[in-house]
From Swiss-Prot:
Gene3D superfamilies: Winged helix-like DNA-binding domain superfamily/Winged helix DNA-binding domain
Assigned keywords, A-Z: DNA-binding, Transcription, Transcription regulation
Comment on protein domains: The winged helix domain is involved in binding to DNA in the preinitiation complex.
The protein's assembly and partners: Monomer. Interaction with RNA polymerase subunits RpoF and RpoE is necessary for Tfe stimulatory transcription activity. Able to interact with Tbp and RNA polymerase in the absence of DNA promoter. Interacts both with the preinitiation and elongation complexes.
Function (record text): Transcription factor that plays a role in the activation of archaeal genes transcribed by RNA polymerase. Facilitates transcription initiation by enhancing TATA-box recognition by TATA-box-binding protein (Tbp), and transcription factor B (Tfb) and RNA polymerase recruitment. Not absolutely required for transcription in vitro, but particularly important in cases where Tbp or Tfb function is not optimal. It dynamically alters the nucleic acid-binding properties of RNA polymerases by stabilizing the initiation complex and destabilizing elongation complexes.
Protein name (record): Transcription factor E
PROSITE patterns: HTH_TFE_IIE (PS51344)
Species of origin: Archaeoglobus fulgidus (strain ATCC 49558 / DSM 4304 / JCM 9628 / NBRC 100126 / VC-16)
Gene that this sequence comes from: tfe
Residue intervals of the HTH TFE/IIEalpha-type domain: 9-91
Family recorded in the similarity comment: Belongs to the TFE family.
GO molecular function, one term: DNA binding
Amino acid sequence: MKAETTTGVEELLNELVGRAAGEVGLILFSLGIEGEFTDDQLSLELGIEINEIRKALFALYEIGLADYVRRRDDETGWMEYYWRINYDKALDVLKRELEKTAKKLREKIEAETSTIYYICPNMCVKVSYNDAMELNFTCPRCGAMLDYLDCSKAIEKIEEEVRRIEEILESLDKNSG
């Protein structure tokens, strides 16, 4: 799967993995490991603390890019985790995360367009019109008069981001279908 992806998709996947699992997660994902492995093996081979490896693997698991099975070690009796990176699910995970982001952005647009906001000129607070009325249009922290906040530019930027995500999703659907 890794060889077939475009540079843009790889960049998006790397951004997603980095955000979810940090630098160690990005290292693990970029290794292209086939088959099962243990966190102990990776820790020894990569020289990275086992707790960092585990943290990254569980973060990858949380977003669906890794799976594990637990097996008892016959010699020690301890439970061991055998991990697998789900490269074959990467595009689906990326699509799902992009769709979640677009949904959150649409909700933000809805909130910004359905509410009138006022802001302190000293950037202490941002409050709704109703809250501003209760405060007599005075900042509760510094006492400055609250100013009307024009959210139109912010809304435009959010809408632009939603369009960009929708274009990416459309492109992913065309390339994977």
